[in-house]
Amino acid sequence: MNETMATDSPRRPSRCTGGVVVRPQAVTEQSYMESVVTFLQDVVPQAYSGSPLTEEKEKIVWVRFENADLNDTSRNLEFHELHSTGNEPPLLVMIGYSDGMQVWGIPISGEAQELFSVRHGPVRAARILPAPQLGAQKCDNFAEKRPLLGVCKSIGSSGTTPPYCCVDLYSLRTGEMVKSIQFKTPIYDLHCNKRILVVVLQEKIAAFDSCTFTKKFFVTSCYPCPGPNMNPIALGSRWLAYAENKLIRCHQSRGGACGDNIQSYTATVLSAAKTLKSGLTMVGKVVTQLTGTLPSGVTEDDVALHCNSRRSPLVPGIITVIDTETVGEGQVLVSEDSDSDGIVAHFPAHEKPVCCMAFNTSGMLLVTTDTLGHDFHVFQILTHPWSSSQCAVHHLYTLHRGETEAKVQDICFSHDCRWVVVSTLRGTSHVFPINPYGGQPCVRTHMSPRVVNRMSRFQKSAGLEEIEQELTSKQGGRCSPVPGLSSSPSGSPLHGKLTSQDSYNNFTNNNPGNPRLSPLPSLMVVTPLAQIKQPMTLGTITKRTGPYLFGAGCFSIKAPCKVKSPPQISPSKSMGGEFCVAAVFGTSRSWFANNAGLKREKDQSKQVVVESLYIISCYGTLVEHMIEPRPISTAPKISDDTPLEIMTSPRASWTLVRTPQWNELQPPFNANHPLLLAAEAVQYYQLLLAGSLPPGSPGPITRHGSYDSLASDHSGQEDEEWLSQVEIVTHTGPHRRLWMGPQFHFKTIQTSGQTTVISTSSSVLQSHGPSDTPQPLLDFDTDDLDLNSLRIQPVRSDPVSMPGSSRAVSDRRGVSTVTDAASGTFDRSVTLLEVCGSWPEGFGLRHMSSMEHSEEGLRERLADAMAESPSRDVVGSGTELQREGSIETLSNSSGSTSGSIPRNFDGYRSPLPTNESQPLSLFPTGFP
């Protein structure tokens, strides 16, 4: 019986790490009435209900999903194997307690594995440092000690420093402390990548080199934020974004935030309330002036402005992006006297102070939020090698959460950057659909497993994008040349919400002639398609679906398992991050919980459109949510532009919170510990790329075997230049040729051997016999040509299909085809001279022998040329496209281009006229 209970238990000890292994548990979805009953049970104290108390849990202060060597897909060779299962990167979860911290790893198998656990007092921030990026002049001084863990705890290693003023670096291989960085002011957060370790202080940022941990640069001009992030920053693979306290005109980038133009019923009511409040405030100020507290004519704002007159006032909502590689050592100062070395972008993002920000995986997109939490902005940063003032910042999306205030604590992107999840202190995660290039999210963009192009093939071939831009320009839109309505996002009419538009954006700083700013997709206002809410009370996991207030989706309420009920505190008013939430996208791991007997290979046969969303809350429960996008149910007809709605459903949960009875799991670890194996694999790959790998050195030991076979092919001296031999294809061929569209006309040019008649009334008449020297048509006097008498009528042809086969070149030498754009305007005389060319040498002598077959052969060839069939190629493989000046001609590759006069055929395969009284009726007497 005990063995059965041990087998069914979701927890068991790990063999390789010695920690605890937690199996995923299937989530049962309750009905609406069951959710209400569960909610009432949670509200009623357990003393009245008489239910037994569950085991005591430790208090969680913060939660975080970490990126380290364990899930580094770019440098870990374990994830480079193709067409094999089990190579998806694991999830790495870090939990901070009031006494210590804990690290979990959730591989693709679904069993959460405890990797690290310690109790040494409160921990404010912690990071697992990835292996540094090596170079020709960069060596890792701590290679033998890695992986390293950076911890900011209440009591530092020295014990004499103030609380949270020290960063201690511990080796997870040996367990010793290898470095300690002291500060005079408290530390609020830690960030790291392959290049630097960033320590976030109040209004300051300090960056240290990842190889030596010596100070690289520091920033002292950060704008303070009331919380939860006292100094919000975003660290990508190379760029660092932070909130600047001033806007410097000479460094300001082109573009920036646009107005949101959102005015719902709730916003109208709140605006009226604010107006009433401001009116009452003015009445109070008048009463104060009459009583003599303040002198007449002086307000509190004037007093505050007078107090700050000694220094320039701080400006909220400004973002500065710097390049951590090119920025100079020492202080990074953005001022009018400083140069722009290392400054990537400098632009206004919000009116209020910035609360949270995050880069996507590529570093091109930046999401920012302010302290109000109504709207979140998505920017696309297009750099310029000259300076930050030439950088283009495109405001792609405004993600509208609602009209109530909420502070954002976490932002995450999906791996393909088509979904953004923003979590607030209220315990709600908002799911927004976006596109990496902007534009309206729809069925075409989000119902495919892969990212689609910005325009479909139909839109490209039909020219819909150009038509839309033309209509927009006529209406004075983003492409309007009118001053003030520039092509920049900041010139949009929606920009009226920003009160300081003149100071933030001007026509000079947003030049419509900037090629990086036009054409741009219009600013899109996107509402969340789903809200995944963590409840204010503790109870069993429940779900409630229904139409969402702002979006066309469904929203769910999920709660973790029942624990000891704390005092009922509103999450929005909780202090110290008590209601913390973190989210991340990843491969589904619920297959084992829902189908215990199903193999992984069979479950992975179905390709999902969206990866699973994992959310962990301060209750220590990790829940996997499935996201299923679909066309909106209210749409009468489904097309590519149909709006979206999504359904979310919980699939599996892991209870990761520890109890006081759990043992600690501290280094030194075994050689087969996942963190140690990952560090060895990444270090081996770094040495392999740098070419400093000792000969005969064995590869790292991994969970899936050695990588000697993978690395042996690229370790020799003869393969040092293998990268230069790689061929890449940046684009595929066109699905149809440009000349196949209805905008192009096809005209047939005929040749004449003996007599060429321009028109019946023309004075130009060239006649020669067989023995005469042929006169080239290019020798004609252009002033004498009566082109108006030709009466050339344009012929509009239907779009033709891509040629499937080609005829022999020898069968085509009698006809030359001219391609003419219908929409273009050009001189007809120039076209005639360029198209006709010159007569071949010895034309009359060589063609006398076949004179009797010329007329019938010409009819057949002209009829074949006009046939729009894939089997009969109009332009054949022997025909090449030549461009002379502004005219494109299709000439034979044999090199003999015959000059002739265009002719208009009224019927398909109609018999050719032979009466010479007609203008274009003559045929050559000899033809090859």
Curated annotation (Swiss-Prot):
It comes from the Eukaryota. It is found in: Nucleus; Cytoplasm; Cytoplasm, Cytoskeleton; Preautophagosomal structure. Keywords: Acetylation, Angiogenesis, Cytoplasm, Cytoskeleton, Isopeptide bond, Nucleus, Phosphoprotein, Transcription, Transcription regulation, Ubl conjugation. It holds the Pfam family BCAS3_WD40. Residues 480-494, 505-514, 887-901 have a biased composition (Low complexity). One of its GO terms (molecular function) is phosphatidylinositol binding. Induction: Up-regulated by PELP1 in response to estrogen. The modification N-acetylmethionine is found at M1. GO terms for biological process: angiogenesis; autophagy; cell-cell signaling; cellular response to estrogen stimulus; positive regulation of catalytic activity; positive regulation of endothelial cell migration; positive regulation of transcription by RNA polymerase II; regulation of actin cytoskeleton organization. Residues 472-518, 795-816, 868-928 are annotated as: Disordered. There is a cross-link at K215 (Glycyl lysine isopeptide (Lys-Gly) (interchain with G-Cter in SUMO2)). GO terms for cellular component: cell leading edge; cell periphery; cytoplasm; cytoplasmic microtubule; euchromatin; intermediate filament cytoskeleton; nucleus; phagophore assembly site. The keyword Amino-acid biosynthesis does not apply. There is a cross-link at K215 (Glycyl lysine isopeptide (Lys-Gly) (interchain with G-Cter in SUMO1)). 'Rudhira' stands for 'blood' in Sanskrit as this protein is strongly expressed in blood vessels. Belongs to the BCAS3 family. Has been proposed to contain 7 WD repeats. This prediction could not be reproduced. Interacts with histone H3, ESR1, KAT2B and PELP1; the interactions occur in a estrogen-dependent manner. Interacts with beta-tubulin and VIM. Interacts (via C-terminal) with PHAF1; the interaction is requrired for the association with the phagophore. This is BCAS3 microtubule associated cell migration factor. It comes from Mus musculus.
